[in-house]
């Protein structure tokens, strides 16, 4: 602690500001990750089968077994690193194996389960087919896109894919997911190269990529998540590359990839915000004037692209403009509502219902949502124990599922086929399901423990 204080005193004013800003996010990050690590040690969240909605359930974990396994893993890795000199060739071999493994296991999952689409994926697929047939009714009345116009980017991808490869060609879309997953694994290695320059870390990363079972299970998931991930990770790499080299050429792929990722999944805007903060701090520290243009394009290009997509579909549908959609505040209000059947703060269709009840008026919907938020806050303020229980259940139900709902997604999608193989059924409903759960649970706990130690140190 004394050494850290002396180091802080020796910093320049700019360095002190950046250090303090780092603590602003690092301390909450440590608290959340450490709490989740403790929860994960004693309890595991999993999803109930055979239902039409997510239903998180909980079971006790085996803390001593988890700790012993982690200790054995650390001991084994330490022994190997000391016994064998880690060369560039060894790192390259591990990376190549992780990439080959990503391709192999992803394709294996595709051809094992041979699933179709369901839930929101089915809505998007049907809308893309309607668009190809000149039917844009989902953009009018109480249509799906009146509520969720942010899905137009993914629908555009589906429309193009169906036009080129045939209607409902889910295999091609799943192959695109494989490409996105390989892109993610490859560029994670490149980011590690840029940030750490340590062969041991490269090998650890390769091993972690091999263990990404939830990601590989999502290969069959036809939605914006996986394609956008395959774009946003390389976008981050090119931003890091620019920060390290200040070569302006890297800003171009960063902007293009970030824009495409946001079009497919609006949640990628979170990464955009993080990139803006980092580039802004870089500009202050290094007096890099080009960052101003970089930031303008990084912010403006997704907006312009989104406007272009909306304008195209508005013209095709004969509308003056695309509906504004459900205000974001509706998700906040829904996330603060109790739910005895599913779980606190989970999706309960409130956002859809409140928007419909207010005749698709964004302003009136916002007012109703703010009232709902105030009501929830007042309830929490008046009943602290209820508040604590609410957020505890919300937290563990969402962040203590080591499978990230990948297994329940496979189960939902598999219902649309009657010819599943015995091996597929073994992993969906049989003991194979529990084997996957155990592997993902150990992986999940290991990641949380390592992240907690890193944030603390």
Regions found by a protein language model. Give the residues of each.
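Membrane-interface anchor segments at the N-terminal boundary of transmembrane helices
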Residues: 18, 53-68, 172, 394-457
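Transmembrane-helix signature of polytopic, membrane-embedded enzymes
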Residues: 188-211
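Membrane-proximal stem/loop segments at transmembrane-domain junctions that anchor or position
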Residues: 313-418
């Amino acid at each position: 602690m004394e050494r850290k204080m002396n180091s802080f005193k020796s910093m320049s004013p700019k360095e002190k500001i950046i250090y303090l800003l780092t603590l602003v996010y690092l301390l909450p990050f440590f608290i959340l990750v450490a709490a989740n690590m403790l929860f994960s040690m004693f309890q595991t969240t999993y999803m109930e089968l055979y239902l039409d909605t997510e239903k998180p359930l909980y079971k006790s974990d085996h803390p001593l077994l988890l700790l012993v396994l982690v200790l054995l893993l650390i001991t084994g890795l330490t022994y190997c690193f000391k016994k064998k000199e880690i060369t560039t060739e060894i790192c390259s071999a591990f990376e190549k194996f992780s990439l080959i493994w990503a391709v192999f296991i992803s394709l294996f999952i595709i051809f094992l389960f041979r699933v179709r689409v369901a839930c929101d994926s089915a809505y998007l697929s049907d809308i893309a087919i309607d668009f190809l047939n000149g039917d844009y009714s989902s953009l009018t009345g109480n249509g799906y896109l009146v509520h969720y116009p942010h899905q137009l980017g993914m629908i555009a991808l589906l429309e193009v894919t169906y036009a080129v490869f045939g209607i409902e060609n889910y295999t091609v879309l799943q192959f695109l997911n494989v490409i996105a997953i390989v892109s993610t694994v490859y560029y994670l290695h490149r980011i590690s190269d840029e940030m750490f320059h340590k062969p041991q870390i490269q090998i650890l990363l390769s091993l972690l990529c091999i263990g990404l079972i939830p990601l590989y299970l999502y290969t069959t998931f036809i939605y914006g998540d996986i394609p956008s991930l395959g774009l946003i990770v390389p976008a981050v790499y090119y931003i890091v590359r620019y920060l390290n080299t200040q070569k302006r050429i890297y800003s171009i792929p960063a902007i293009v990839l970030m824009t495409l990722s946001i079009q497919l999944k609006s949640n990628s805007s979170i990464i955009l915000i993080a990139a803006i903060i980092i580039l802004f701090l870089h500009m202050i520290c290094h007096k890099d004037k080009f960052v101003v243009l970089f930031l303008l394009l990084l912010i403006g290009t997704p907006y312009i692209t989104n406007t272009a997509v909306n304008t195209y579909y508005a013209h095709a549908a004969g509308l003056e403009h695309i509906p504004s959609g459900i205000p974001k505040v509706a998700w906040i209000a829904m996330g603060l509502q109790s739910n005895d059947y599913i779980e606190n703060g989970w999706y309960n269709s409130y956002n859809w219902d409140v928007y419909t009840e207010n005749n698709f008026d964004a302003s009136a919907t916002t007012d109703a949502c703010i009232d709902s938020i105030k009501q929830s806050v007042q309830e929490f303020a008046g009943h602290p124990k209820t508040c604590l229980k609410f957020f505890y259940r919300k937290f563990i139900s969402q962040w203590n599922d080591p499978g990230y709902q990948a297994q329940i997604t496979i189960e939902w999608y598999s219902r649309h086929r009657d010819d599943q193989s015995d091996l597929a059924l073994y992993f969906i409903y049989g003991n194979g399901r529990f084997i996957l759960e155990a592997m993902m649970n150990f992986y999940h706990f290991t990641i949380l423990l390592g992240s907690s130690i890193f944030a603390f140190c």
